[in-house]
Amino acid sequence: MPSAVVHPDVSVVITFHREGLLAHKSLLSLSRCRAAAERAGVGIEIVATLDRADAETQRIVRDFDAAGKPDVLLAVDVGDLGESRNNAIAHASGEWVLICDGDDYLSEDFIVRCVQSAGKYDERTILHPELIVMFDGWAAISWQPEDNDPAFHADCMLVCNPWNSCSFARRTTYTDVKYVRARPGESGFGYEDWHWNCETHAQGYSHRIASGTVHYVRKKSHGSLNQAHADGHALIHRTKLFDIAP
């Protein structure tokens, strides 16, 4: 297992809750990504949160002993994905941050390609995976757009989220635009990723694609956070992108 990097280039932020054995597979995916990044001279740290995680998930994450082992492991009690990410980002030290979830996978050279793509753009650019492969509960593939594509119009974000939760940007992007609390059962508001995409777009950040990257997204047949938000008829928080009312 590689030793922790003193001054990492990229902080990988990953959140765990009740993934159980699936957490092991996600950490194996990060192991491959980290090995590929280090071969390319990119220093990596992994910052993970255990947010009200069950005993099985805690055991798997704490005992994992390969390249994907978290360098920083935070036990938090917030019960909210956005706040868990904010906590992890506050403890990250990389110039760049990659956001991922505890039951998804990334293509092996994902981080390398993100770093290479980032060098083509200015500091206010957010990168997203090019291809989304959905599996498990149902299977599908989709390509994500860039916001400078002639076919893209920001008005679509009123009714849909054009980019999924996985993103790569400078750490200051995430500290300047934080994730909001999204607990539809308490407030009726949800979809923290959708809201974050709206806010960053409204504040002048560009959304681009990291060419050749693949995000493998587990679509659970039941128990997913997105499904819970949909079942609760959640709305996104008020966003500057559509801030036309007083």
Name these PLM-found stretches:
Residues 109-141:
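Conserved donor NDP-sugar-binding/catalytic core segment of glycosyltransferases
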Residues 19-35, 60:
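Short, well-formed alpha-helical segments that are part of the catalytic scaffolds
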Residues 76-92:
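Glycine-rich, basic loop-to-helix element that forms the pyrophosphate-binding segment
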Residues 97:
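Short aromatic/hydrophobic "clamp" motif used to bind/position activated sugar donors
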Residues 187-196:
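Acidic donor-binding loop at a coil-to-helix junction in glycosyltransferase catalytic cores
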Residues 150-169:
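A recurrent flexible, glycine/aromatic-enriched loop bordering the glycosyltransferase active site
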Residues 134-139, 210-229:
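Active-site donor/metal-binding and catalytic loop motifs
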